[in-house]
Amino acid sequence: MTRKNNDEIKFDHHHDGIDRRGFLKCMAWAGTGALCVIEGGVLKSYSLSNPFSMKRHAGRELSFVQISDSHTGFNKPANPDVVATLKAAVDKINALPVAPEFMLHTGDISHLSRPEEFDNVDQILKAARPKNVFFVPGEHDVLDDDGKTYRERYARNSMGAGWYSFDMKGVHFVGLVNVMNLKAGGLGTLGNEQLEWLEKDVKHLSKSTPVVLFAHIPLWTVYPEWGWGTADSAQALSYLKSFGSVTVLNGHIHQTMQKVEGNVTFHTATSTAFPQPKPGAAPSPGPMKVPAEQLRSLLGVTDVKYARGHHPLAVTDSTLE
């Protein structure tokens, strides 16, 4: 990796960890936030501390924000006040230089699927500048009644267990569900019915259409020993091989990770509630207690921008500090 100037980091493809299959993996800098743009297979990252890096990407045609893993109802030592940090996330969204047009919430809205937990999130999100919110469930949102309460609130017009798609300013968005019937430590699954629907959903699209998939559990294998992956994600992604630009946004692992494979950029978001250990750094995943003064540096939101005619989507991770 080589540093070109004070705000741009350009990856050297001879020394950046791309293996013979063309994978690129990078971890975002904890506590700083980074603006990542993929152009011609080159990943460029800009420090959020430099306002000029943000201005270069202002004025794009479509801007939206991803939040994840609010876990309202959680009150353990890893974060005894998840409501306060969710409110801080909304404040961060409202302070973005370009107002997002909508939000994606990639699941674990609640901690125990209780109505009052969903109520808290709904009330807090009303204060956000973007008023439209699109949800997919996390496993904590479907603990009871096979997810019926979740679907009645957030997915009334969806298919199956809550999957759906929509179009916005030339971008096709697909919300997927990979948390049903999840076993402890097991991989997520999409299932045949949802896969068949996805194949039909994208078949009619022009191959130049940018596609954004969003689901709770990563659609790439981050760490199978902890269930951080989706067993049948390869089948889903096979339907998108001929598209020029595919972005996959996930949550679940409570930390920012990114991988580029061919035409697909994978990105996982931090939580607004609590961090989890890095893969393999602890005996098991779960809420990780850190010194109170460090907590907000490990929580955050993700801002995504797209300009028509430009395939790369700019993905910005901001901490709650």
Which residues are covered by each model-predicted region?
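N-terminal secretory signal peptides
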Residues: M1-D19
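N-terminal active-site segment of His-dependent metallophosphoesterases
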Residues: F11-D12, C26, L43-D119
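N-terminal export leaders
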Residues: D19-V42
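Extended active-site neighborhood of metal-dependent phosphoesterases/phosphodiesterases
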Residues: L48-F52, R56, R114-P210, D232-T247, ...
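Active-site neighborhood of phospho(di)ester-bond hydrolases with catalytic His/Asp-centered motifs
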Residues: I67-S68, M103-G107, F134-E139, F214-A215, ...
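Surface-exposed cleft-lining segments at the edges of enzyme active sites
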Residues: F74-K76, I109-S110, V179-L190, W220-E225
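Short, well-ordered beta-to-alpha junction loops that form the rim of enzyme active sites
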Residues: V177-N178, F214-L219, G251-I253, S318
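Short acidic, glycine-rich surface-loop motifs adjacent to enzyme active sites
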Residues: S206-V222
